[in-house]
Amino acid sequence: MAVLIFLGCLLGGIAIGLPIAWALLLCGAALMFWLDMFDVQIMAQTLVNGADSFSLLAIPFFVLAGEIMNAGGLSKRIVDLPMKLVGHKPGGLGYVSVLAAMIMASLSGSAVADTAAVAALLVPMMRSANYPVNRAAGLIASGGIIAPIILPSIPFIIFGVSSGLSISKLFMAGIAPGMMMGATLMLTWWWQASRLNLPRQQKATMQEIWHSFVSGIWALFLPVIIIGGFRSGLFTPTEAGAVAAFYALFVATVIYREMTFATLWHVLIGAAKTTSVVMFLVASAQVSAWLITIAELPMMVSDLLQPLVDSPRLLFIVIMVAILIVGMVMDLTPTVLILTPVLMPLVKEAGIDPIYFGVMFIINCSIGLITPPIGNVLNVISGVAKLKFDDAVRGVFPYVLVLYSLLVVFVFIPDLIILPLKWIN
């Protein structure tokens, strides 16, 4: 009965147009009524406690760092260096988009922000160079979803808080699969570019490459600081977020001098709006998560899937399929917040590596961001590239196919994720 109440309120709330955070609060209130323990004060206290976590402080810092990068000229220079290096290859702008997305992924941690920034810079150039815009937009969107995989990742922070796992280990575990996703996308683009006979850009001189490198070195040094800090144990994810925001602000104002106080004010407002949405969603989900535990929903799911516990591989496949279906119709953050407390006990009982599960969870949900019928990142790229949603879907289809194929490879060869993590550690 608790499952029906939760799903009914969640789907009903979404159907009538409630934001997902309010739909989760509705689920919490309904479960409290059903458990005969409704108390506004308890709900309010749980809501406040849900956002009261030191680890969650990393979110506003990384959001602010991403906003400063876009407004302060860092993103532009990050795109410029790959442009000089590989822009002269056939279909070179496609490789540039993936490389730029991977570099920016190590700075922003947001698929939407990453996609919007790269698309705003490269789509006009691709259109003027007579690239098929739907394929180009599909590639940029597919590169953008690497952002939640490569550190610093906001979804990994939320997953770590929800599951109690080490956020630093999740960050490190995402590096190798994120790079594999980027390599897979570039191979797919190479195959398409060779068939489409795409034009080349003018080859940059060594002087132009050097100038681009010198200009972008300050922006490119930021991921080195973050990864080095984690690897050496110099700072926690929250402290890394603060360092990233301060460093980006320093470079934008002192080195590049492209950010004024007026621009900074707008950046702070934008970061505050984004952070408030994410944090309210996290807090709302904690109310539902607490009541889900009291209603023993994880135990019900565990009992339902208990016959599969003795076959971890089969259980893992079933879980991945369930996440895939949910991820196609729901955004990444609420999917993590809703399913993590339900699935994590079962994963641990089956002896599945929880860090491996966390990485696979986020990869699966990230691909869902470019999978119809919802595809939030598809909506972003459609708006920036001025494409119809249907055209964006057709353009992204081959990349969705290869990314899901890579996900299947990760399911059957978990060492591709586990062994690089052991090497990094």
Model segments located where?
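Alpha-helical transmembrane segments of multi-pass membrane transport proteins
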Residues: 1-425
